[in-house]
Every structure is written in structure tokens, then in C-alpha cells.
Amino acid sequence: MPQGDPQGEPAFREAIRGYLHSARGVNCTAEQIVVGAGTEYLLMLLSRILGPDHTIAMENPTYKQAYRVFESLGYPVVPVEMDGSGLETSLLEGSGADIAYVMPSHQYPTGIVMPVKRRQELLSWAYKKEGRYLIEDDYDSEFRYKGKPIPALQGMDGRERVIYSGTFSKSIAPAIRVSYLVLPKPLLAVYKERVNFYTSTVSRIDQNILYQFMVSGCYE
């Protein structure tokens, strides 16, 4: 059996695209999706796309594994304090960071849900300077304890500044090491130039099983 598409099987990526659009309000094409074995792997892949000269801002407290990945890759990491609405954008401006890693839908470990106004402030920060990006980790958006979910930050972005990250590990089982990135179109072009030769780290068999699960309607 051939190795398949480095980004993930086209039909599987199209199923992810359809689900993200209907469930999370994410606006993308299947071509913008990159499938990989776990969020940590995809963050390492993302580092090859972004390059070395960046400073990463992260919510304090945050997901320690992502913090360790960024540190191990040599990025300066700046913790930014939160209030009841999430990461404080006024502090972000003075942090010196040009990339911010955030979990607006259900911040880990605090559980804060970032309101729309704060999300708009984050986007305004990203738009102020060329080369700024937001990494949106939407790791467990399928779960809600009360109220309706707020659509993803990516769906509010009109200037291609949000890198969206999702996973099947929380919604199905931790052993399902299948995650995905939605790359802004400018970064997709860089991906194809720099790392498109990497073989997909998720087997075609696993991708097809998940694809069948999604198109059958069982996932939703």
C-alpha cells in the first residue's frame, strides 16, 4: 500500500473540514489541514514552518506539555497572566511576543471560556504587526458543561492570522493519537516549500477508520 498524502488522506481531511465548519465555525479548505500523530508532533512540525526567530506568549497557567515543546525547540516562552476572561491582552502587548498560544474555548487548567470581546482584542493584537500569529488549541471543544459553545477564534479571523489545532484524543480516546492543524494560507505555502516531504505519521488505515466513523454520523 502506498504511503499516502503527507498532509493526510484527502477524503479524511475533507471530513474534518466539514465537521469543523458545522460544529466550530472554522473557515478553511481541506488543503489547509495537516494531520499528525498528536499535538506535540504537530507543534514540532509547525516550528519548521514558522522558523526560529519568534517569541511565544502562553497563558499562565497553561498546558505544560506545549510549554515544554516550545522550550525544547529553542523558543523564548513568556508567561502572560490571565483574568476572568482569559489572557490579558494589555500584558500581551508588552510581552515582546509575536506568537500567542491560547485555549479560548476551554482554557486548561482553569476552565475559563474566553468571551467574544477578548477574542476580538486578541485578533487586534495579531493584526497590529506583520508576522504575528495566534495558535488556537481547541483540544476539547466538543464538551460543554453549560450554554452553547462560542465558535472558534479561527472563524472570527479575516486576515489569516490564526493557526487552529484540534485532536480526536479527547473526544474519542487518549489512545487515538490523531490531531490536526489548520494552517493560514500564507503558512500553507511555507509548509509545502519546507516540510511537505515528511511522511504522514498517522497510518492510512487509522485515517480511513476515522473517516468512516465521521461520515457515518457516529462522531457527531
Q: What do these predicted ranges mean?
A:
Residues 2-131, 142, 148-156, 160:
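Conserved core of the PLP fold type I
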Residues 8, 145, 201-205:
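A generic short alpha-helical patch detector that favors 3-5-residue windows
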Residues 64-69, 97, 133-134, 144, ...:
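A generic "structured core" feature
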Residues 137-138:
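Walker B catalytic acidic pair
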Residues 145-148, 175-177:
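Short aromatic-enriched loop/helix-cap "lid" or pocket-rim segments at secondary-structure transitions
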Residues 163-220:
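PLP-dependent aminotransferase class I/II
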